Amino acid sequence: MIKDPFERLGLDREVLTVSQLNGRARVLLEDVFRSVWVEGEISNLARPASGHMYFTLKDSGAQIRCALFRQNALRVRQALRDGLAVRVRGKVSLFEGRGDYQLILDTVEPAGDGALRLAFEALKEKLGAEGLFSTERKRPLPAHPQRIGIITSPTGAVIRDIISVFRRRAPQVELNLIPTAVQGREAINQIVRALQMADRQGFDALILARGGGSLEDLWCFNEEAVARAVAACVTPIVSAVGHETDVSISDFVADVRAPTPSAAAELLAPDSSGLQQRLDSLQRRLLLRMQSRLAHDRLRVEGLARRLRHPGERLRQQAQRLDDLDMRLRRAFALNMNQRHERLGRLDTRLAAQHPGRSLKLLKQRLDSLAERLPKAMRDVLKDRRQRFQAQLQTLQVVSPLATLARGYSILLDEHGQAIRSAAQTHNGQRLTARLNEGELKVRVEDNHQTPVTLSLLD
């Protein structure tokens, strides 16, 4: 504890400037209040483009400026707004430029009912997104239940109010209490177990009930485990938690929400006097309908009696009809047989026309004809091919180089066996081969002018 901060900072004799004073005050505050928790209500919330947040934290008697810088503001899960009760943590500092005393925050969280409200809205949004509140899941309540399970505290006014309503309106209904705590942390698991056990008992409907209280008192009915246990039940459930203004997550998940436990009992307890009046009305309507039906049937019987004939006459008519049917059946049978005989004859004629022996005979005749024509055709083809060959042979002999040689000409070949067609292809002294009709001569070029080449035989 600082007994004399002025003496510690040497301020008893020294004259300071304003900047020096504010600077030393900031050091003193930050040294003493390094991390403190403060609870209050947000007001004058500002969000500049920098991402920082500035607001005033106040209670009924005082206020203090607060700064929440961007890196810490990003970690705040809930949306801040004016009027929100929060619990903040930070260090006490002083803005030297204005001499303002302020809190530099690193943590902001909802306080008291504010935290519970935010948790309520978060769970409501989560379960709603999963479809647990959809009307398609809601089951209708039985019109005339016989056995009902009541999940609530065994003591208190709630169970007495429910029993009183059933005794007055439907004393014939069997009521079964499944006792459980309805407040505190232990109540959560007890309610879940009670729901699971009641759902296995084959009740026509269940009532989940609790009397009024604060938000914290009713909080166990806003827990996710309880909500999912309600949703998992096969038995229709009426949720009656708190007073008419109280709303819980269980109310949204249940098949029906009742504003009070007594109202839940009235939903499931058919009014005996009303039922008796309805039964009387139905009895009168049934009697009138029976009388009308009897009168109608009496008239119908009288009409049938007038139309009724002696059994012997009816038997004779039936015998005559039977004889007529017998004759028609015989004629139909004979006609059918004749038609079948005619069809069989047509099929026999078609089958004979398609007999394989006839086809084979025609094919044999064609084969014999082809066998007779084949030798002559082959001779004609050979004769034609022979004549064409002779003509082509004569043409070949006319254009053959050998025929030219036979007429006294020769062919000159160079040393590579290539034919000499021009004097320009030779040179003086070149050795050539002269191919004749019969044999070859070795010659040498004496003169290769464009005039006729002079050759001489080689020795």
Swiss-Prot record:
It holds the Pfam family Exonuc_VII_L. It is found in: Cytoplasm. Bidirectionally degrades single-stranded DNA into large acid-insoluble oligonucleotides, which are then degraded further into small acid-soluble oligonucleotides. Its EC number is 3.1.11.6. GO terms for biological process: DNA catabolic process. Heterooligomer composed of large and small subunits. InterPro entries: Exonuc_VII_L, Exonuc_VII_lsu_C, OB-fold_nuc-bd_dom. Keywords: Cytoplasm, Exonuclease, Hydrolase, Nuclease. Belongs to the XseA family. This is Exodeoxyribonuclease 7 large subunit. It comes from the Bacteria. GO terms for molecular function: exodeoxyribonuclease VII activity; nucleic acid binding.
